[in-house]
């Protein structure tokens, strides 16, 4: 099972979320892949705590763990997830249309 590490925290005035983590969550849902979410505190990310840096060198969210594979950077993660499962492809097969979709 894939584990998505992202940042989310509720405050009295609203919720702080990782936009990139939210994008990855949408991809996981659209692809129908089994996953679990682990919430990382904003302070741990902002301070680049050693336990975060031990997971990957950038110390940012989101990142995923899929078995022994650890990926970070939402674009890389989302491309991997799209290619991992042929179900519900997220990009067109035509190269020009695919490039335009990526530009969005």
Regions found by a protein language model. Name each.
Residues 1-104:
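GST-like domain detector, emphasizing the conserved glutathione-binding G-site
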């Amino acid at each position: 099972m894939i584990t998505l590490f992202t940042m989310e925290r509720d405050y009295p005035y609203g919720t702080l979320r990782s936009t990139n983590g939210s994008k990855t969550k949408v991809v996981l849902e659209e692809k129908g892949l089994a996953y679990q979410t682990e919430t990382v505190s904003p302070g741990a990310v902002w301070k680049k705590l050693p336990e975060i840096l031990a997971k990957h060198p950038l110390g940012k969210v989101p990142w995923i763990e899929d078995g022994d594979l650890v990926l970070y950077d939402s674009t890389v993660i989302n491309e991997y997830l799209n290619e991992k499962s042929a179900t519900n492809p997220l990009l067109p097969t035509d190269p020009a249309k695919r490039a335009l979709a990526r530009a969005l």
